[in-house]
Amino acid sequence: MKRLLAISSLTLLASLVLLVVSPARSLAAQDEVTVVDALADAADSEDGDHDHDHEGDDHGHDEAAGDEHGHGDGDHAATPLLSFDGGSAIWNLIIFLCVLAILSKFVWPAVLGGLQAREEKIREDLESAEKASAEAKQMLSDYQLKLDEAASQVQTMLADARRDAEANGQKIVDAAKVEAAAQRERALSDIENAKKVAMAEMAGQTSKLAMQVARSVVGRELSADDHADLIRQSMERLPSQN
């Protein structure tokens, strides 16, 4: 495509040169014919002045010459401007070949070099655009992957936090249950100890009361054995506190 474009441009330039040169050569040829005719007229005028004494004899000759000259002018006037000239065609061909050689040596390489440089620049721009597009797509893919990873990590952290909260809550509940059981055991132990103390105090008071009653009734002091029997009997008579 580039070679055809260069050849077409060179052919167009050569044709323009030929169009400029050919009319110039035709005008030069016409000017040459005009100069020859002028010289012939001048020679005829000099001959007429030189033979003025023989005007009568040469009058017919001059008229004939005038008719011939006029006929020649008519022939020149009747000559077409676009007549084929072999010499001009050869010269035009030579000029065309010379112009074509000059253009091929100096213009053609510059044109081809410019076209190649432009094509290379366009190709590099396209490659750069494709590379930038590929990099942008890769960056977008990496960014989306990072977003997905971050979302997954957040979900994992939330699940861990929920599991830890549930585990800590269960631990707190278990600890509360253990503490409540321990407090219940301590309360039961305290109640049992208080019951035992109360029973012991009650037994002591009952023994004293029984001794006083017995002393007042019997009128004598009880022995230790009697005292123990009375305590035992009193304890048996008391209702159970359990």
Swiss-Prot record:
| Molecular function terms from GO | proton-transporting ATP synthase activity, rotational mechanism
Question: Is this entry keyworded Transmembrane helix?
Answer: yes
InterPro entries the UniProt entry points to: ATP_synth_b/b'su_bac/chlpt (IPR002146), ATP_synth_F0_bsu_bac (IPR005864), ATP_synthase_B_chain (IPR050059)
Q: May I have one GO cellular component term?
A: plasma membrane
Q: Which CDD domains match?
A: ATP-synt_Fo_b (cd06503)
- Which positions, given as ranges, span the membrane? 4-24
Subunit and interaction comment: F-type ATPases have 2 components, F(1) - the catalytic core - and F(0) - the membrane proton channel. F(1) has five subunits: alpha(3), beta(3), gamma(1), delta(1), epsilon(1). F(0) has three main subunits: a(1), b(2) and c(10-14). The alpha and beta chains form an alternating ring which encloses part of the gamma chain. F(1) is attached to F(0) by a central stalk formed by the gamma and epsilon chains, while a peripheral stalk is formed by the delta and b chains.
The family note in this entry says: Belongs to the ATPase B chain family.
Q: What is this protein called?
A: ATP synthase subunit b 2
